[in-house]
A protein has these predicted regions:
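Short loop-to-alpha-helix "cap/lid" segments that border enzyme active sites
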Residues: 3-160
Length: 160
């Protein structure tokens, strides 16, 4: 599956799920697997475990690493990863500005509703994590093809 990821025309985001009984060298295992498959420059890896992602980043700097935050109250934490994956409910423009200041990418997850997909395509975010890749691609294409000031005005007044 990981070797076929380019067939989707989209970067693959791999989530490492921790359960508490992982070996102490888990960061090495993750980094080694990406190197073994030769996909460290083509994929991104993310986890709820910030320490793991920071260790992977030290071992394999070219691999884009991220920290999943299911709920954020307050400011973005300082991290040594490339991006934050923020749950849709916690998003606001203040957080987007903080991410830019910290020079980190901001991805929003899991956005499967077309209304929310449209919303986030118009927000200052760097990516949308979705199970509805075709809908996302179609909406991006539509926005690119219908991008005059009049089109934008109509979308604002109709809220679509």
């Amino acid at each position: 599956m990981l070797r076929r990821q380019n067939n989707f025309g989209q970067k693959l985001l791999v989530e490492v799920k921790m359960y508490g009984k992982e070996p102490s060298n888990m960061a090495n295992i993750v980094a080694d697997k990406f190197k073994e498959l030769g996909i460290e420059k083509d994929c991104m890896v993310v986890s709820f475990d910030l320490k793991l992602m920071e260790e992977v980043k030290k071992i394999l700097p070219e691999l884009k690493t991220g920290y999943i935050m299911p709920l954020l109250l307050g400011d973005l934490p300082d991290t040594n990863v490339d991006f934050y994956a923020l749950e849709d409910f916690s998003y606001n423009e203040k957080i987007a500005i903080q991410a830019k200041i910290k020079k980190k990418k901001l991805l929003i997850w899991t956005v499967n509703d077309i209304i929310k997909i449209r919303k986030y395509l118009r927000q200052p975010v760097d990516g949308i994590i979705t199970d509805e890749l075709e809908e996302l691609k179609e909406e991006k294409k539509y926005l690119k093809e219908n991008n005059t000031y009049f089109d934008k005005y109509i979308r604002i007044i109709t809220n679509i």
